[in-house]
Amino acid sequence: MSLRRTILDLHRQTQRATLSKSLPFSMSHISSASATAAVRNPLGRDLSSIPFAQAQKLKPDSTNLVTDRSISSSIGQSELNKAAKFSRQSSSRGYTNGSFLRKIPVVFHIHEGMEEILADYVHQEMTRNLIVMSLGLFQIIVLKDIILFLL
């Protein structure tokens, strides 16, 4: 029994020694208050262990930070609300009717490109025609859904 106690005491002493000699930036043995102070402090050290005069030098300069949010502006609150509402509507929609009309020729260009690719890689004419018809029907369905969504 005495040998076991001796081993446990040695283990406890080595743990205490390693905790007291650990690196100053180690976060494994720091209390929560010290950890928050270390996070706030740019050097990562606990300010409570430093003399007051030196701690004042280490604190970040808060005079440059903007604390007052009441900055005067020429834009009124109602104009800001209108702009925010318009922004929400346009961003949720993501497009305009004018931008959609300019993209219709792209669909036909994609169709022609797919026909060319199929002509190069699909050598059976019947299979190629079936794939072209399927892709054409798919494009018609997509266009129908887009037009119904716009209305």
UniProtKB/Swiss-Prot annotation:
Molecular function GO terms recorded: metal ion binding; succinate dehydrogenase (quinone) activity
Subcellular location: Mitochondrion inner membrane
GO terms for biological process, alphabetical: mitochondrial electron transport, succinate to ubiquinone; tricarboxylic acid cycle
InterPro entries: SDH4 (IPR044963), SQR/QFR_C/D (IPR034804)
Keyword Disulfide bond on entry: no
Transmembrane segments: 130-150
Pathway: Carbohydrate metabolism; tricarboxylic acid cycle
Record carries keyword Transport: yes
Cofactors that this protein relies on: heme
One GO CC term on file: mitochondrion
Membrane topology designation: Single-pass membrane protein
Transit peptide: 1-78
Principal cellular location given in the protein's record: mitochondrion
UniProt-annotated binding residues for a ubiquinone: Y121
Positions bound to heme: H109
Keywords associated with the record: Electron transport, Heme, Iron, Membrane, Metal-binding, Mitochondrion, Mitochondrion inner membrane, Transit peptide, Transmembrane, Transmembrane helix, Transport, Tricarboxylic acid cycle
Tissue-wise expression: Expressed in flowers, inflorescences and stems.
Self-association and partners: Component of complex II composed of eight subunits in plants: four classical SDH subunits SDH1, SDH2, SDH3 and SDH4 (a flavoprotein (FP), an iron-sulfur protein (IP), and a cytochrome b composed of a large and a small subunit.), as well as four subunits unknown in mitochondria from bacteria and heterotrophic eukaryotes.
Function: Membrane-anchoring subunit of succinate dehydrogenase (SDH).
Name by which UniProt lists this protein: Succinate dehydrogenase subunit 4, mitochondrial
